[in-house]
A protein has these predicted regions:
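Short beta-strand/loop segments at the ligand-binding rim of alpha/beta enzyme cores
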Residues: 2, 97-102
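Ordered, amphipathic secondary-structure segments that act as subunit-interaction surfaces
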Residues: 87-88, 104-105
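Short, ordered loop/turn segments at secondary-structure junctions
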Residues: 39, 64, 106, 178
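Short, conserved beta-strand segments within well-ordered enzyme catalytic domains
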Residues: 35, 58-60
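Charged catalytic cores and adjacent phosphate/nucleic-acid-binding surfaces used
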Residues: 1-9, 13-15, 19-24, 45-47, ...
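Divalent metal-dependent hydrolysis catalytic cores, especially in the metallo-beta-lactamase
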Residues: 23-43, 100-102
Length: 233
């Protein structure tokens, strides 16, 4: 089962993607589900239930929380709660809900500072930072996994995330970070079992029965790992 774990709709102020266009494009490219990782407060539960009931596709409500240690994708939590801006407090909130946390695009702007600074290492020389040094950042001990494939990242930024995830023994996740139909599904997460609801989705994440993947849009789906593997089927 293929799910894009990182998508923004009009509920995020910086997105131009309507739910209707999202579902249409997701079906066209071969996705089985989409996570709506909205900025801010995300969807009201009742509004989301009405939205999801309109489409023959798995839609997962989620949040992308702006914290003191970068952006964290949160799954299995009802909505925004006070204290989420601090990662350690966010960890407690997510644990209480039985949810799952993924650090999103951890090395964005690490190697090209012309558009801003990296969230985790604002003063570091990205050219000199090793994966082992990067893996020592405390955020990686507070999250459940690392986003290793993000459509808004450069290959080098995603590559460093993959190296860090490997060092930490994490599976890694994939998501497009789409804010329009462009690139939706460019990175996905392949689940070993079918998922029919949020509860099952979080259960599969916590069990580690998933693999980040790329190549769906080119018709050559393959695991997003540091080694060479045969294409997923």
């Amino acid at each position: 089962m293929l799910i894009d774990l990182h998508v923004h709709t009009l509920k995020s102020a910086d997105s131009s993607l309507s739910p209707e266009d999202m579902v249409r494009e997701a079906k066209r490219v071969g996705l089985d589900g989409v996570c709506l990782t909205e900025h801010g407060g995300g969807w009201d539960r009742h509004d989301f239930e009405r939205l999801a009931s309109r489409y023959d596709m798995l839609l997962i409500p989620a949040l992308e929380v702006d914290t003191d240690m970068g952006h964290i994708a949160v799954f299995g939590v009802g909505g925004y709660a006070p204290g989420m801006a601090k990662v350690r407090d966010l960890r407690r909130i997510v644990d209480a809900a039985g949810g799952f946390m993924v650090v999103a695009h951890p090395f964005r702007r690490m190697f090209d500072r012309t558009t801003g600074r990296n969230f985790l290492f604002p003063d570091a020389d990205g050219q000199a930072l090793t994966a082992r040094q990067a893996a020592e950042h405390p955020v990686f001990q507070l999250v459940d996994d690392v986003e290793v494939g993000n459509g808004g990242n450069s290959p080098r930024e995603n590559g460093l995330a993959r190296e860090v995830a490997d060092m930490l023994g994490r599976k890694g996740t994939g998501g497009s970070d789409a804010h329009s139909t462009h690139g939706l599904g460019c990175f996905v997460t392949h689940f070993e079992r079918d998922v029919r609801c949020v509860g099952e989705f979080v259960e599969e994440l916590r069990a580690g029965r998933y693999t980040p993947a790329q190549g769906l849009l080119q018709g050559k789906l393959r695991p997003l790992t540091t080694d060479s593997h045969p294409a997923l089927t």
